[in-house]
A protein has these predicted regions:
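Extracytoplasmic soluble-region selector
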Residues: 26-125
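Short glycine-enriched loops at secondary-structure junctions
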Residues: 169-172, 227-236, 276-286, 326-332, ...
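Second-shell residues forming the walls of enzyme active-site clefts
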Residues: 155, 179-181, 203-220, 224-226, ...
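Preference for extracellular/luminal or secreted protein segments
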Residues: 89, 119-188, 434-698
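Active-site-adjacent structural elements in enzyme catalytic domains
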Residues: 202-219, 223, 254-272, 484
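Hydrophobic faces of well-ordered beta-strands that scaffold small-molecule active sites
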Residues: 161-168, 193-197, 224-230, 277-281, ...
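Sec-dependent N-terminal signal peptides of Gram-positive bacterial secreted proteins and lipoproteins
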Residues: 2-29
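Catalytic domains of carbohydrate-active enzymes, especially glycoside hydrolases
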Residues: 182-198, 265, 269-277
């Protein structure tokens, strides 16, 4: 069973401790140690005890203020072994006996303790287990205020480094799949607090686990935030991971349980690799069918649905031990411009924003989201500040990423968010076209951002931020506030340098067991099956294989995935790869068919116009056969706008193999469709083709 409450076992927790970096032994390491504390005594740490085990961790706090995880040369002891025992690794086992015990740790010179009270109630049923409640009694005192002590001991350069998260996607023109000496030097020179990984960097499970461990080994005083965009659906980075259906597919299921399971499974895979921060989920409300960048990355057009499923996904992700990031605040759903390519605008007033765009983010904040990513989008009704673009000297509105009114006044003060604010990538044209690299970074920090993601020119930006502090453009208090939030997140998620290196082979073995596991594949298949939405069916589905003697499958380059699924039912199906009107030979196959399955794939508005080559092909097929034509909207459910007269239409919301298989299983009646449209499908005459919530079944 995929259950968080059954995952708190000694084996899993022991492996979890392996995913953080280690400090190289040094002759004066002992001399710098000022204290030894139990991690769970730190006020910012939420201790969850489920089942009968808990893994305690010990930290050495150094005279300079930074802290490292103590893993060797320490001894654990329980004062009452009838109540609980503790092993050499700090794993506490509770025996279901009423009473109290102190768990003590010592390194021979320093020690700390934490108390547990156990109260057991009789089983409610004859064959059920007794109910055990464990209460944690933390030690208190200034010794546990390690975050502020750490900040006090950092230089300005070190503080700024914590606020930078560059990518090392490529180096000297080649994808970075192994740690390079030059990258290690940059991490240490600029005291980096984190990095972001891309698909080029995470090729295999073994390679990824080793690269992440090497990144962490290169870190200085604190562990790195290792982030990635593993949303599921069309935005996935892990090449060896489970490609979960995306948010709109989950929106079609209407299932909070599935959203949690998908979030948890994604988190398990990331955690197994040592990746501790996921830049997901997307909480944008996709109420604009012309949106070229969000689309199926959103749970749908209804803010309550987005909030409900988004919070479930967040809880699953964070229950796995991985930090979640809601994006793109205050909302990128109602735009028709891709901020990677231009500067979009959301023109709505505060009342509308409060009810729609901001609603899912507010619910995520109330649920304890770790971080929020900003949008490179202008909101003139929130901030009407004009700045001069470096691109052409014209006046433009200030993007949310650089807006004090959006990040501080709205997000911090009005909505009450005190977690980490991270910018979207600063190399996107919505920012880089209009602002210089240093100007953009300084404006983002002044606005309230804690982490500058993918700064353009690491050295230039690091030095520029330092100068801005020195000349009074950014206050020391502003920097300290960001560093406090970043270190709080790291402490909360248990991201520390370890004093001794873990067993790399053990990390790899665990990652191989988790990443792409059969358990996760089953969740992927379940989510895909429940997402398939039968939008139209003129009494042609389900198809019966006994009556389909000549099936033709048509589609673009993704037709191979569709073909693979179809051949599980009709091994001799004819396949045509095309995304434009067919030639005579291809048309002849269509004319001879007794059924045609067409997969259409569109990225944007132009792709689904009836005049586009792909849609002309679909119309051509209609004109050349009397056989039923079944269409699948592979990505966007809006494709049917271009061919409303099709006999049957299914929406699958993504191009994962599991989604193709689920769609084909539905066509042949093996999967009963239960998906409901998470968006409204308009018609080209200004009306509505299919309402939000529409969905047929058998």
């Amino acid at each position: 069973m995929l259950s968080f409450y059954k995952k708190i076992t000694a084996a899993v927790v022991a492996v979890m401790m392996l995913f953080v970096p280690w400090a190289s032994p040094s002759a004066n390491a002992e001399e710098t140690t000022a204290d030894l504390i139990i991690y769970q005594n730190i006020p910012e740490v939420d201790v969850k005890i489920s089942g009968n085990q808990l893994s305690l961790r010990a930290l050495h706090v150094h005279q300079e203020g930074y802290f490292t995880e103590a893993t060797e040369g320490i001894r654990w002891k329980s004062s009452n072994k009838t109540v609980a025992a503790v092993d050499d690794h700090g794993v506490v086992t509770f025996f279901g006996k009423n009473g109290r015990t102190f768990i003590t740790v010592t390194d021979g010179k320093r020690k700390d303790r934490i108390a547990f009270k156990v109260k057991t109630a009789p089983a409610s049923h004859k064959n059920s287990k007794q109910n055990m409640k464990v209460t944690v009694v933390k030690e208190k005192g200034s010794r546990y205020n390690i975050i502020q002590k750490a900040i006090d001991g950092l230089t300005l350069e070190e503080k700024i480094g914590q606020m930078l998260m560059p990518d090392f996607r490529n180096f000297n023109g080649k994808p970075v799949t192994d740690m390079l000496p030059e990258i290690k030097e940059l991490i240490q020179k600029y005291h980096l607090g984190g990095v972001i990984l891309f698909r080029e960097n995470v090729v295999t499970t073994e390679q990824t686990a080793k690269l992440v461990a090497d990144y962490q080994q290169a870190a200085e005083k604190f562990g790195l935030l290792i982030s990635i965009d593993q949303e599921g659906g069309i935005v996935t980075r892990l090449q060896s991971g489970t490609n979960m259906p995306g948010n709109m597919a989950l929106g079609a299921t209407r299932s909070k349980e599935l959203a949690w399971k998908v979030g948890y499974a994604i988190g398990e895979e990331l955690h197994a690799l040592g990746i501790n921060m996921n830049l997901a989920p997307v909480l944008d409300v996709n109420n604009n069918p012309d949106n070229p960048v969000i689309g199926v990355r959103s749970f749908g057009e209804n803010p309550e649905l987005v909030a409900e499923l988004g919070v479930s996904y967040i809880k699953g992700l964070q229950d796995s031990g991985v930090a979640a990031t809601a994006k793109h605040f205050p909302g990128h759903g109602d735009t028709a411009v891709d901020s990677h390519l231009g500067l979009p605008e959301v023109p709505h007033d505060r009342d509308r924003l409060q009810k729609v765009e901001l609603y899912p983010f507010q619910k995520a904040m109330e649920a304890g989201i770790d971080a929020v990513m900003t949008a490179h989008v202008t909101f003139p009704k929130v901030d009407d500040t004009k700045v001069i673009s470096q691109k052409d000297g014209t006046a433009i509105s200030l993007p949310a990423t650089l807006s004090y009114k959006v990040l501080t006044e709205l997000m911090r003060e009005e909505m009450g968010f005190d977690g980490v604010i991270i910018t979207d990538a600063m190399n996107m044209k919505a920012i880089s076209d209009h602002f210089g690299p240093v100007d953009a970074a300084v404006r983002a920090v002044q606005a309230g951002a804690d982490i500058v993601l993918m700064p353009v020119g690491l050295e230039e930006v690091a030095n520029g931020l330092k100068k801005a502090v020195q000349n009074g453009g950014i206050s020391q208090e502003r920097i300290n506030a960001s560093v406090k939030r970043i270190l709080t997140l790291k402490v909360k998620r248990g991201i520390f340098k370890q004093e001794t290196p873990p067993d790399m082979q053990q990390i790899i073995n665990q990652a191989l067991r988790v990443v792409g596991s059969q358990e996760h594949k089953q969740i992927e298949a379940e989510a895909a099956a429940k997402s398939i939405t039968l939008v139209k069916n003129d009494h042609v589905l389900p198809l019966q294989t006994s009556k389909v003697n000549n099936l033709v499958v048509v589609g673009n380059t993704m037709v191979a995935s569709l073909e693979k699924a179809v051949r599980t039912y009709v091994p001799n199906a004819a396949v045509i790869q095309a995304a434009a009107p067919l030639n005579e030979a291809q048309l002849q196959k269509v004319k001879e068919a007794d059924a045609v399955i067409v997969g259409t794939y569109t990225l944007n508005v132009s792709g689904r116009l009836p005049s586009s080559p792909q849609m002309k092909m679909v119309q051509q097929i209609f004109a050349n056969t009397d056989a039923p034509v079944i269409a699948i909207g592979i990505r966007n459910p809006y494709d049917v706008m271009a061919y409303p007269h099709v006999a049957a239409y299914l929406a699958q919301y993504g191009f994962q193999q599991a989604s193709f298989q689920a769609a084909v299983d539905t066509i042949f009646g093996v999967n009963t469709p239960t998906g409901k449209l998470p968006v409204t499908i308009p018609s080209y005459d200004g009306g509505v083709l299919y309402e939000y919530g529409h969905g047929l079944t058998y």
